[in-house]
Amino acid sequence: MQLTLRAARINAGYTQQQVHNLTGFARSTLTRWENGAAMPTIGDLIILCNLYEVSVDQIKWQ
């Protein structure tokens, strides 16, 4: 099953503020990543996937 970053975050039960608190990523950066306006580095993507408990392969890009 493919998920957007936003869907993966919501399915994991996190708000953007909680992800910010846990990772240090700015909320504006998270929004850009979730909207497809910017791409996270592979390292940042791995951090998010670990937090959301999904594999990188499960993330769908717009």
Question: Predicted regions span which residues?
Answer:
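DNA major-groove recognition helix of helix-turn-helix/homeodomain DNA-binding modules
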Residues: G24, G43-Q58
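Short, conserved catalytic or interaction motifs in soluble domains
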Residues: N35
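A short, Lys/Arg-rich alpha-helix, primarily the initiator
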Residues: M1-N11
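Residues within the helices of the helix-turn-helix
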Residues: R6, Q17, I46
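Short alpha-helical DNA-recognition segment
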Residues: G13-R32
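The alpha-helix within a helix-turn-helix
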Residues: R9, H20, C49
